[in-house]
Amino acid sequence: MFDALARQADDPLLALIGLFRKDERPGKVDLGVGVYRDETGRTPIFRAVKAAEKRLLETQDSKAYIGPEGDLVFLDRLWELVGGDTIERSHVAGVQTPGGSGALRLAADLIARMGGRGIWLGLPSWPNHAPIFKAAGLDIATYDFFDIPSQSVIFDNLVSALEGAASGDAVLLHASCHNPTGGVLSEAQWMEIAALVAERGLLPLVDLAYQGFGRGLDQDVAGLRHLLGVVPEALVAVSCSKSFGLYRERAGAIFARTSSTASADRVRSNLAGLARTSYSMPPDHGAAVVRTILDDPELRRDWTEELETMRLRMTGLRRSLAEGLRTRWQSLGAVADQEGMFSMLPLSEAEVMRLRTEHGIYMPASGRINIAGLKTAEAAEIAGKFTSL
């Protein structure tokens, strides 16, 4: 029976990790893998996470099942962080998920169960978006969201896609810190998006994976909160991997903004049912850590301060890198004004390969770089290697 299976292609980013590890050159640089790294090249554990884990170790008295919906206090605290007081809490359904990927898959399965077949996806996007949606049976319509040579969001294309979408279609939006481009939507553009989505009867699915990495915790969800205040229905997939440094703990959630308490209850029951037939229930530890941090003023303050330090470091790295890159590409001065961990450089696959073989700089063939993979002292030198191609 197993002989009937075709071998699946390796994930390009995972393959890149393997190549990087085998490279014995001391000056090698990993700009591919999407994790935050500090000045020593480590992916640190937040101080508040360590403190919360210690507290849980001392106080947790059971490992019993928690159910498909997950930790309800975690969901309440996370929604307060994401949605604020934008809408009535009883109109929001939430289910804890195994990370942001689990949230996106549950959202896609819910859309399919409701009879929705199509979802609009701006390109480039996170490489796993399309496979997740396809696996749920959704048809994907695409449009060009970002122009790499000019380093600019093609907002007219986004507007045209929304205007051309059929009522009931879903549309994937990045809340902030766009992966992989770092492209930024203005407040006015978010207002136009919200008005169009409401007018066209579309269902927004908003991917929130980097809250606090762009302009700040509240600023990074300002557009999302405006959208939630305008549209009657929306889905929000939240990941705690980056904002809390809980990558391998798989802590996330899917939230549904509905128009009534009764509607929220229906959505919640369907999300829980979909979870039950998939992974049954989410892992508890990461969510318990997040809940503990957000519930404790001192831990929350410490977490917020450390997150802000990381954000400011990435902002500084962007400025240093952009200063060097603009000597070859004037448009890449825009890298300094982009948000989050990622930017996309106008490099060919051959140039990406040269960077790897000649300089030990590892990045995907697409030209996407992880800003947080740089060290401050080497940013100018790395920029010089890019511009020397």
From Swiss-Prot:
An example Gene Ontology biological process: L-phenylalanine biosynthetic process from chorismate via phenylpyruvate
Pfam families, per the entry: Aminotran_1_2
Keyword set includes Transferase: yes
Cofactor field: pyridoxal 5'-phosphate
Listed Gene3D superfamilies: Aspartate Aminotransferase, domain 1, Type I PLP-dependent aspartate aminotransferase-like (Major domain)
E.C. numbers: 2.6.1.5
Catalytic activity of the protein: L-tyrosine + 2-oxoglutarate = 3-(4-hydroxyphenyl)pyruvate + L-glutamate
GO cellular-component term (any): cytosol
CDD domains: AAT_like
Record keywords: Aminotransferase, Phenylalanine catabolism, Pyridoxal phosphate, Transferase, Tyrosine catabolism
Residues annotated with N6-(pyridoxal phosphate)lysine modification: 242
InterPro entries: Aminotransferase_I/II_large, Asp_trans, NHTrfase_class1_PyrdxlP-BS, PyrdxlP-dep_Trfase, PyrdxlP-dep_Trfase_major, PyrdxlP-dep_Trfase_small
PANTHER family: ASPARTATE AMINOTRANSFERASE, ASPARTATE AMINOTRANSFERASE, MITOCHONDRIAL
Subunit note: Homodimer.
Family membership: Belongs to the class-I pyridoxal-phosphate-dependent aminotransferase family.
Family annotation (NCBIfam families): PRK09257.1
Function of the protein: Transaminase involved in tyrosine breakdown. Converts tyrosine to p-hydroxyphenylpyruvate.
Protein name: Tyrosine aminotransferase
Organism: Rhizobium meliloti (strain 1021) (Ensifer meliloti)
High-level lineage: Bacteria, Pseudomonadati, Pseudomonadota, Alphaproteobacteria, Hyphomicrobiales
